[in-house]
């Protein structure tokens, strides 16, 4: 047994050292730039027509709008934690999910430059569509799960092209992403 892998701390260090520097840069760049860009939305309650109708016990339209997996996720999270609109909590979860997505994209494109990786993470998380998503903060974490699923599906297909089971899992991830919010299919393509 590897001495570094014998403790949880050693395992974390081993995994951390295997992550390319550009991927880490994209991840942390997305977090920092995401917080700088969206902190006003996270620290203030900005209501809109949809949120007034769906708070405190909703997550948006479900299967009737083709968002069958949003209904499943919303029901699961609603049963466990309740459906609340907490901008800071929802925003931090969303930024984390989008930062992971930015890191996966940096890995897919095999980026070497830390500066370009930070720029990728920054552009990815400060894109106007993300700002628009954060105006519907009560459902933003679900939509960011859809982004992560779509990017993860593409990453798995590129990283493991000859693994049939992972390719099938990628298709399932794409289907679930489409079942949350159809607009994020372009992330996979």
Regions found by a protein language model. Give the residues of each.
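Transmembrane signal-anchor helices characteristic of membrane glycosylation enzymes that use polyprenol
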Residues: 18-48
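Membrane-interface micro-motifs in multi-pass membrane enzymes
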Residues: 63-67, 90-94, 115-158, 179-184, ...
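Short hydrophobic/aromatic helix or loop-helix immediately within or flanking a transmembrane segment
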Residues: 61-92, 96
